[in-house]
Each structure stands twice: as structure tokens, then as C-alpha cells.
Amino acid sequence: MPTPHLIYFADPMCSWCYGFSPVLDDIRRAFGRTLPVRVVMGGLRPGTETPMTEAAKLEIAGHWRHVQDATGLPFDAGGMARDGFVYDTDPAARAVVVVRHEGEELASSYLTRTQRAFYAEGRDVTSGEVLADLAVELGLERTRFLTEWASEEAKAETWRDYAISQHAGVAGFPTLVAGPNEEGVYGVVTRGFAPPAQVLEVLKDWMARIAA
């Protein structure tokens, strides 16, 4: 039977995924490498071309306040406040896919770093240069990262992630799936945000059952 693992369907520019990032940290602390996490990009708004209106910015800022109230995480709307900002989630998602070539753990760390850059630091993570800066922070070589990020192969791989999400019936983010059990079946741990204690309880119960 394949090693039990988690599949995390997420998007770097999904505010509730940012809110869920401390939960993933708790999962890593609780289970370590006995329960590895594979990150799959869900595709929140890939290919968006129209700049945000001021009304849309206000609406999304309201959603961010809900996440902040629920999680206590910091928010800075500077990344979205720029004139002509296009909320295209594909560049950041593709960056995570490129980093994933270096390993799942690094991809997960890069996802978290990108979320923090956008939501807490107000940086424009639709920019390849910003995404490269973040990759360099984690030890990647800048030119190689940008070359891979701009490649047709990376674009195609990212859209395959979106297709996997759709095929799996994932309709919202974050979604966390665990599997396989003794019958080879995968099950949903949470659809949408859930507090750490709830998620850890579900996972501990699941791990105990498949180990029995």
C-alpha cells in the first residue's frame, strides 16, 4: 500500500488558504515526515486579465477581514491596492509548481512564503521578479527559477494541476485530502478553513485506524 499522505489543494492568492497556513505548520509538527504533504494548485483565478475595480478591492478586503478575525493573521492590502492591479493567480501558482521540482517540502514552504508576501507584506506576487526574490530566499538560483517559471512546460504543468483539482471535485480552497486507507481510498479532511485542533483530531483518528 502506498505511504499515507496528504494532498493539499490550495492557491497562493486564496485568503483562506493563507489563514490555513498555521494549521499546516501544526500538522508538520504533529506528524513530521510520517505524513507528507503534496501541494496541488487549485486555480482560483488563473488567466484573469481585467484590472480590479475599486469596488472589487473593497469587497475582497472585506473577505480578508473575516480571515483576520478568524485567525489573527496580519493583512496588508498594499499588494492589491496598486492602480491597474490584475488579480491573476496563475503566476504565483506556477511559481509553486516550479519550486515543487525541488521537493514537496520546499514547495509547501514556498507556498507559505508567497502567501505571507502577498497578504502580510503587501507585495505583488503576480510579478515574476517578486516571485524570484522569494525563491532566492529559500535557496533557489534566480536565473534558473525565472527560466523555468516562464517556460511552456511549467505553464502546462500548472494547468494540469488545475485539471486534477477539477477532476477531484474540489470546488473551494483550502481542501485537504488524506489517503490511502487500507482499501486504497482517499477521504476529505476538510473543505474550507478549519481550526487546528479539529484538523489534528481528524488526522490522529485516521492514522490510528489505518495503523490498526
Label every model-predicted segment:
Residues 2-7:
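Extreme N-terminal starter segment of soluble prokaryotic enzymes
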Residues 16:
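Short, cysteine/histidine-rich loop/knuckle motifs that typically chelate Zn2+
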Residues 21-29, 113-212:
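C-terminal cap of thioredoxin/glutaredoxin-like
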Residues 1, 90, 170-171:
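A generic fold-level signal
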